[in-house]
Structures are given as structure tokens and as C-alpha cells.
Amino acid sequence: MAKVSVIVPVYNVEKYLKRCLDSLINQTLSDIDIICINDGSKDSSLQILEQYAQKDSRIVIYNQENSGLSVARNTGLEHASGEYIGFVDSDDWVDLDFYEKLYNSAKNNNADIAVADFIREHPNKKPKRLKLKEEKIYTTPEDKFMICKVHSEGCVWNKIYRTEFIHSINLKFVPKMYYEDRDFTIRSLYFSKKLVTTPNTYYRYFVNPKSIVNKRRNYIQDEHYILVRQQVLQFIKEHNIKVPDGLYKAEIYRYKLFGKTLFTIKESINSKYIFLFGKIQIFKMRLKNNG
């Protein structure tokens, strides 16, 4: 059994895939599985995967019809047999000591989840980073939610998860859903017994202008954006998780700002966008009424 199974969904990323795979096959922690899910790529991504798999037996390829990121990750979860599970998007990359440090941190502290730093790499902007100060254990939902910034980030790729823990709560990604990380993240953080932070190693998130979430938004993405953020706040309230008041105020501001933005662009004139704007206003009122 490998120490970490790394799940890599792949869809039309021929330009960036080698960089991603090179960062994985050269990890200082060599005892890893690299589970690549080819999600119906139409470019040369599959050929690149096959070339790497011929040279490195740790790379396993599963092919499926294009079904989206959530389904691809779920396929990876079905085949993951490592002690821990990690996720890497195929246009991103990781520091070479990334999984060694995460695994040692999780193992030494008997943690269900280990979380690392990340850098958001933008082609034309200064990198944005999450900077963890120290290795520290967190056990309460409130602390885990705040250190992982679930209200603004909620990502799965800068973490590893104990496989047994993920299977014990039957945790999967919601199919056909944009921003699918958020639901997985809040549930894993809430139900985990222990989380440990792992500083000084980075997941490199590449802001790819051609990726799904960075393309010109459509009304489905906008609706999912609203629904996912709503789920976070509802989950916090339903499970009586105490978070700073500023979190709710920040969320209300996001909805208000987002609604105004939708209303100023041409596409917002159609009924679907008006429906979304109405939903934002309704949810904002609910938040105010709930304190």
C-alpha cells in the first residue's frame, strides 16, 4: 500500500500536464500512487499520460467519457488504495517535498487531514499565498474552518486525507457541480477528529485563463457559486459552529456585490439572471434575520 494516492483529473491540458507530472514523479516521498483520470480529453493529454506511464509504473491511467471534475475525482477515490489521498489539478504543480512533509506531519500527529501552504500563480499578477506559520493541531470545527478559510477558499488540493476516514463517512464530490471543493471540504473538516497544519511547502495553483472556473461565467456557474456559498453558511448554522460575526458580514457583502455585478452586464437582462439576482437578495435577507 502506498503512503499517498494522488488523484489527478485530466482534461485538455496538454500545455501544462508535463509540468504537473514532473512535480509528482520527482517527489521526495517516492512511495506514492499517481492516479490519472483522463476525462475524455480531445487534445494530446492522453498521449502524454501514456508516455509518462511507460516510464513510471506508479502512474495509472483510467479513461472515461467527459463527465466533469467531480466525477473524475470520484473515479479516483474509487481506485485510491494509499494510506492517505491527495488531489492535484492537472494544470497545477507541487513542491518536490510537498507530499513527504504532508505525510510526515499527518502520520506523526495521527491526523485525519494535513493542510499545507499554497501559492496562487497568475500569469500577469503577483502570486497570492496562504502562509501557515507553524505545525499545529486543530480539533474543533471552528478552528479547522478558520485556518482553512472555508468561507473564501475551501479547496481540497493543498491537503491530504486519511483514506480510511474518507471512506468511513462515505465522502464524495457532488457530480455536475461547479466549485465542488467546498462541500467536500466543509464535511471533511467537520467530521475529522484532528487536522494538522504543515508550513514551508507549497501547492502551486495556476490561474489558467482557459480553465472551467476562469472562463466567461454563465448563469449555471453563477447559480452554483451562490448555492455553494449558501451551503457553507447553512452547514455552519445547522451544526452550531461558532465563527466570527465578520464572516457573515463578509458573505452578505459578497452576495450584494455579486448581485450588482450581474445586474450591470448585458446578460443579466434575461430572466435567468434576474432569477439569480432575486435569490441573492432573498438569501441576504435570511442571513440578516438569522443574525
Where are these regions (language model features)?
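A conserved acidic beta->alpha catalytic loop
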Residues: 23, 38-47, 65-67
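N-proximal low-complexity "stem/linker" segments adjacent to membrane-targeting elements
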Residues: 1-26
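Short beta-strand/loop segment that forms part of the nucleotide-sugar
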Residues: 31-40, 60-65, 90
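C-terminal subregions of glycosyltransferases and related glycan-biosynthesis enzymes
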Residues: 155, 197, 206-280, 289-291
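Glycine-rich, basic loop-to-helix element that forms the pyrophosphate-binding segment
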Residues: 64-80
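Short aromatic/hydrophobic "clamp" motif used to bind/position activated sugar donors
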Residues: 85
